[in-house]
Amino acid sequence: MEHNNVNLVECTLRIDPAVLRELPERCKITSINAHGVSFWAKTGRIDVLLSDGTPQSFFVKVLSEEIGMSMTKGEFHSMSAIHEVTPEFVPKPIACGTYDTIPDTHFFLCEFREMTEKMPDPDQFASGLSKVHQKSVSPTGKFGFHITTYAGNLPQYVAWEDSWETFFAKSMKQALDLEIQVKGNSDELEVLSEALFEKVIPRLLKPLESHGRTVKPSLIHGDLWHANAGIDADSNQPLIFDACCFFAHNEYEFGQWRPACNRFGDEYITAYNKLVQISAPEEDFEGRLDLYRLRFDTHVSALFVGDETLRTQ
């Protein structure tokens, strides 16, 4: 399913000057090849020799049109935010920008890290992820992000909000509106939506911020399914990539792990909860994760217009 009309052959026959300016000075390009798979972009690997003869590799993602510019900016700022907190946990982001020679074509550039296809060790992965969540500090003290980020090719709600319940409700509403735009509304959906916003969300999220409790706005990856994580082939340490960040309740991250098709099983949540205390009230933990899953599932249903099973599952 392709949503980007960038011609990879045209883009990789030579390096656009805008990309070249972001590579190390006086480096020599030795190869450019397609690398990786994306529904929304063209991706490639650039191999160079530095001026001292040292080999180095870079990953480039290329998108087109105005939405492509917004997506590359969102990813660059997301990866930069994670890298600032835990530089060992993500490939180093280098730049985002617009091609000089191909109209309306935009890129995201980062260091290339060779990765294995194995799932990361739960304890090692939980250690890295917990550092992102715990060490990060919202610049406003609120939930949200300073720039729109995209899960797939659809925007996420990122406006700054004081309350996590308020932020999540607005985020859920935006995802639902996007889904209804492409798959239509129904009387049943109207009834379910009313119950969701008037009863379910307040029931599960209001207690987090009641009776003296507070929720720390934590930097989250935003789309942390197993295809956006790997193991560095050289260091054997876990890595995450393809982020679409915002500051959220840390447990929101795990809503993406609930579907059976996801390879982040219960052992990863168990490992994480050894390091980070479950938010009170703990008895609502499973219910909160199911609610967060609904937000992810709704967004995914909006992304894949022709798949009606995503709405009914």
Regions flagged by a language model, labelled:
Residues 34-166, 170:
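ATP-binding pocket architecture of kinase catalytic cores
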Residues 160-169, 173, 177-178, 214-219, ...:
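Active-site Asp-x-Gly
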Residues 14-23, 98-102, 137-221, 232-235:
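An alpha-helical support segment within catalytic cores of ATP-dependent transferases
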Residues 300-313:
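ATP/Mg2+ or Mg2+-diphosphate-binding catalytic cores
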Residues 1-32:
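Juxta-kinase regulatory segment immediately upstream of eukaryotic protein kinase catalytic domains
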